[in-house]
Amino acid sequence: MKRLLLITLLIGYIYPCVAQDKPIRTEESLEGTVIYKKTTTFEVDGYTYQCDVDDGSQFVTLYNKENKLKYEKIVYKDTGKTYIGSWSSNVIEYDRFMSQQADFIVDQAFTKAMADEIGKTELMITMLLSPNTGEVMEVNFNFFTFEPYAKVPLHVYREIEVKLKEQIHFKPIEEGKQLNYIMLAWMQKPQGKLPPLPPPGSLM
C-alpha cells in the first residue's frame, strides 16, 4: 500500500510539470467548406474583397475591391504600346532581401495547421508596383476552387496584402519607369508559423 501511495504521489507531482513544459497548442486551421466557389464580394471588418471565379476552369482571382489595375494591360506610359516582357528583360533591380521578406510575410500569415493541411500545393501571389517608387500598390491571389486555398479565411489574405504594402519595395530601372505599373508574381507553398506559447506555469 505504501508503494502504491508513493507511485500515486509521484504521478501527481510529475504530471503538472509535464503539462506545463509541453502545453497544448490551439491554432486556426482551414475552413470546413469552400469559401471562394463563385464570384462574390466580401465585406469584412472595414475592407472589401472581390472574388472572381471562372466558371469553366474554376480559377479564382481574389483581390481588394479598391484595386484599379488588376485587369489593366501593362503599357508604356508615353506611347500606350503594350509591354511584352521576357525572362531576359528586367524592370527592377534584383533585391534578395526584399524577395526573402515577401516569402516570409506569406509564411507568417498561415498557421502551421493550415500549412500542414495545404500540403505541397502552391499559391500564386502577384504584386503590382509603382513604376516611380517601386512600392506595392496592389496585391492579387490566384488558386482553384478545388485547392485548399479556397478554404483559407479571408483575413489571411488581407494580412499578406497589408504587410506586403507596408514592408516591400523594389527599385525600378529605366525600363520599368516607363510603364504604367510593374508586375511581380511568384508561386509559394506557405510554411506557416508556430503559435506563441502561453506564459510559464499556465495551461491552455
Region roles according to the model:
Residues 4-16:
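Sec-dependent N-terminal signal peptides
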